[in-house]
Amino acid sequence: ISYTATGDFAAIMAKASVLYKDIDSDFADTCLEAAKKAYSYLEANPDMKGYTNPEEIVTGEYPDSGKADEYLWAAVELYIATGDNSYVDAINEVLGGNYNKGLGWAAIGTYPLYDLAKADGIDESLKSAAKDEILCQAETLLKSCEKSNIFVSIKNFPWGSNMNIANDGMLFLMANNLEANDKYLEYAQRQRDYIFGVNGTGYCYVTGYGQLSPVSTHHRPSQVLGETMPGMLVGGADSGLEDPYANAVLYGVSPALCYVDNSQSFSCNEVTIYWNSPLIYLMTGLQYTGVGICWDS
């Protein structure tokens, strides 16, 4: 059991209780009770560290030393689900300190901010502060993207850079939902366009789409089938050259071009849930807003 996973569980169960309340009230009650128990565990174990692999586990680690964002998310969702003001002190404590903001798998603090900003029947000062923070993040991101000749915020492309870009698209959509702004919609589209081929490599990073897309993914089910399954987003450019194959063939290449379509390159061509899910959000959000135009470069 990790503190961070327990916080995630509490948040998701609380959200589920709200979503299922009018569909299956018994299940919703079960979810809410589970959320409260998980939150009680967090409260009883404040000194518990974040997550690192146990000694006997040698596969890739998903470390998370910052736990305040998960605690915040749990408190926010339980506050929204119950209306219990006892959670407000915990929320304010985290918001007044340092916590990891973001939409990834480790830094998740922007999710609870967005839910606070959208919620009804809650403390108005909390709601306003959350909205202001989301808009501040979006404005900072917008300025960074506008300085780029490929309209993305990344300069040194990390492992899973496409996740970062899809997450940026999510943030623009979230901000637009809170305060309509054509620039947010424009740059949400630009993040989508990058993923679908408007990038230095010319690759559409979603398998099975476009004239040039990955055909040799680091994806075991596809390797068993003998061909890459369509509809999967790969990690994309990684200037860290973090596997032997990429290091051998991409050394000295510009950061945005550090991509190779080869199943041995797990740092470039891996497929994961957590960089496909933000792309689904981005595509669905753009469809929901009815935005289908192509912006002039």
Language-model region placement:
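A conserved hydrophobic secondary-structure block that centers on an alpha-helix together
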Residues: 1-38
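Solenoid-like repeat scaffolds
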Residues: 95-102
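Short, glycine/acidic-rich hinge or "gate" loops at secondary-structure transitions
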Residues: 26-30, 51, 292-296
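Aromatic (Trp/Tyr) and acidic
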Residues: 1-16, 61-93, 110-147, 155-296
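Hydrophobic, small-residue-rich alpha-helical packing segments that form membrane-like cores
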Residues: 36-40, 44-47
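Flexible helix-coil transition and linker loops at the boundaries of alpha-helical arrays
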Residues: 48-51, 59-61
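Short acidic, glycine/proline-rich loop/turn micro-motifs
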Residues: 21-22, 53-58
